[in-house]
């Protein structure tokens, strides 16, 4: 039998003692003293930061929103029903982060970046903070490149540029979501990555949107962030910030991204609910005092950043490229009241608004854009040359038509010039009508608007304008494909292009039926 040497035993014991890790990680721990409606009040978390992740028993997390003298108010990110008074809560020392990167394209995720489309886990290499400071004035660049929405009425009269914030506002059932989805579909060949944030919508509605994006092939360059109506208010509050962080990944690397918030009215309602449960003092319409800041800090993150910013952010990996994040926030009004609290806030934050009207929608004018009060404050400098040159008279024609139409109701006999102006206005109104999921390219719009401006539609019946326009575009796409391709790629307008368009329209009118 082998005997152990006492010196060996002592050496072994010394080695074990030397290897023993006695370091301790100090965790700030508190006790839950109240749980109600997704809000917990925790006693004893002295070192909690605002917005810090709080860990509860059972792997559940919360977010610290109220830092009071003797307690912390936190909102639970998930099902709060498993939490009880007396359970422990721990600080994590981290703020909320979500996965970012190209791996999220084509996927549907919740407000925390977890996949909810049944297609397995997302192998994202990077995460980023949900709440970030927007780029400063020095790092920004003016908006001078277009985002084609595919809508004639928008691209000609209310153009949107890369890095712009353009509000889509209107009552329920006026086509706000349809316009946003069409804007995503129109980016098929533009290289713009898209993020669609659904806030407080029915799950069936979100499923329909995803299905339509898949059918049109748009899901390949789109991420859908969904916080449905059944999700906790905290998720609906966080979803826009999460989506914005996912979009910023592309902006900061010299690419272009488009984000749609559908809609921010429901986010404001969710935030009001959280604030009231946290016992914050209510203000106008029971919203908390910082509801303006809720939206301004979100929408300020949409911007066009300079090549220097991109180069600095990527440590020189990407040079000579500007990045942009374009935002199309949606606001739902009640009975057309644009002077309510949240609509006026968002109107003042954004760079213009597209106002959709119920009366126009019901009259069959779709998209139901009211060109009179819709405006784009910075998009004009981002329009392509050909659209800018040709679309100048469209808004004027519609404004004059509306004025004359109101006057003509009381006048029995009209002079020839007034009658012609009225008829031209009617034709332009018809021309702006468009089917859903059928975006017009730059060339398509150029041909349509040129035909209208030069009087080629004057002899076409008003009710046949839509059919005439569709037939004209189809003719140009088949017979003048190289010209259309040139216009789409360059956006230039010169005498040769004008002559070619003119010849094409005359040839169409001489040889085709419509």
UniProtKB/Swiss-Prot annotation:
Statement: the UniProt record of this protein carries the keyword Cytoplasm: no
Gene3D superfamilies assigned: 2.40.30.20, ATP synthase alpha/beta chain, C-terminal domain, P-loop containing nucleotide triphosphate hydrolases
Residues the UniProt record annotates as site (Required for activity): 374
Subcellular location: Cell inner membrane
Enzyme Commission identifier(s): 7.1.2.2
One Pfam short name: ATP-synt_ab_N
Protein name: ATP synthase subunit alpha
